[in-house]
């Protein structure tokens, strides 16, 4: 039996994709901005479509209901207030670095309404970046923000490791060339 060639795959899952899009659209860092994507026109029982990583760090799940976010933020703020100078807040912030630097700030967050059309459009642009390097038959799309790519046949062509190829594609996403 012939020896099978070793396969190399790249899995890309865009971190908190909807929340990240909303942060970037606002000129905010997706990793340090407290933001949820949810429809405020519904009740607080509405499920958040996304929660930013910094807000998840406070124990809020990625698919929390809005009332759970409200309740958890109240709990966090009660604890922060106990530890604040004179047990008083001097303001609020949705930015994690500010909250870490100033215990007298209350935890706040942005509620962004969902924009599915925008998320699909950006997902298409991201997919086009992948297509600059990988043929569509080697890209398996799992969801709007997840792909698995078989890059075995491309490593020799590009003279890269799988990690280098992944980083090349990811870096291209951060440049203005991504949508070209």
Where on the chain are the PLM-derived regions?
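Gly/Gly-Pro- and Ser/Thr-rich, intrinsically disordered tail segments characteristic of DNA damage-repair
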Residues: 1-176
